[in-house]
């Protein structure tokens, strides 16, 4: 790392990033005003696509699931790296995105996770273009969709499964306001939707028939008794439950 930091091109790129801060902030705040819940990132994706073109990336396009990708070409056959930040936020489309400023501090829903990272991606692309740095391998910039919640990393999973677009030797995700460290080999995750089915019926006249909600409750109770290893740290949670139509109706279906 010390050797890399001494390279003139890297020094020039770092200087450019500092000088580009005002533009980066401007684009950051503009993107904050674009609603982008998971599965509804289209408007923000188009904004990012245009900015990637302006930044000098090649093969800029929006893929089948809505990811925006652009490539900074390398000089040879070196490792191919993806650098990514996700376009979706956790906030519903109707959320008030009014931007507030107190002193030098800006605030609004989604301003951090992960809109700032997308602005940083664009600035990094401009820095490479301005300084002409080219490594041996390609750097693929990706503004990926559906990272949050039930999006379940849909965009980035698609990017890695899309072999027509080539393989990746490394992946860097910008996804935290904390710049004091790097997480190496991040935690994996699995998400499941489990649905319980029954015939349904009236809670009085149909009393005694199998009740999916009761079954789901028993399942949740058993899950809560699971014992997991401390190393590697392993966690679980039943995060959302849905089902039922009325207080006096035996549900025909429920899910967790």
Pin down the residues of each PLM region.
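Acidic/histidine-rich catalytic neighborhood of metal-dependent amide-processing enzymes
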Residues: 105, 110-187
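Short glycine-enriched loops at secondary-structure junctions
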Residues: 85-90, 96, 176-179, 186-189, ...
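Short glycine/serine- and small hydrophobic-enriched flexible loop segments
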Residues: 30, 122-130, 218-224
């Amino acid at each position: 790392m010390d050797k890399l930091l001494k390279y003139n091109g890297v020094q020039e790129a770092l200087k450019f990033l500092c000088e580009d801060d005002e533009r980066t902030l401007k684009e950051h705040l503009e993107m904050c005003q674009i609603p982008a819940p998971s599965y509804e990132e289209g408007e923000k994706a188009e904004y990012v696509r245009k900015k990637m073109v302006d930044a000098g990336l090649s093969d800029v396009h929006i893929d089948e699931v809505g990811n925006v990708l652009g490539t900074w070409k390398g000089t040879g056959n070196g490792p191919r790296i993806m650098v990514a930040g996700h376009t979706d936020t956790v906030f519903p489309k109707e959320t008030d995105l009014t931007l507030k400023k107190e002193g030098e501090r800006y605030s609004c829903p989604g301003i951090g996770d992960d809109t700032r990272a997308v602005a940083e991606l664009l600035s990094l692309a401009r820095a490479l273009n301005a300084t002409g740095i080219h490594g041996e391998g390609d750097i693929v910039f990706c503004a990926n969709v559906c990272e949050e919640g039930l999006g379940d990393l849909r965009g980035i999973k698609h990017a890695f499964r899309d072999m027509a677009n080539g393989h990746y030797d490394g992946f860097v995700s910008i996804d935290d306001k904390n710049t004091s460290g790097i997480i190496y080999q991040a935690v994996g995750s699995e998400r499941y939707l489990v649905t319980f089915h029954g015939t349904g019926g009236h809670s009085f006249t149909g009393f005694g028939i199998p009740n999916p909600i009761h079954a789901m409750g028993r399942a949740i109770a058993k899950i809560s008794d699971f014992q997991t290893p401390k190393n590697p740290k392993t966690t679980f949670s039943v995060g959302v439950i849905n089902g039922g139509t009325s207080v006096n109706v035996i549900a025909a279906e429920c899910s967790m």
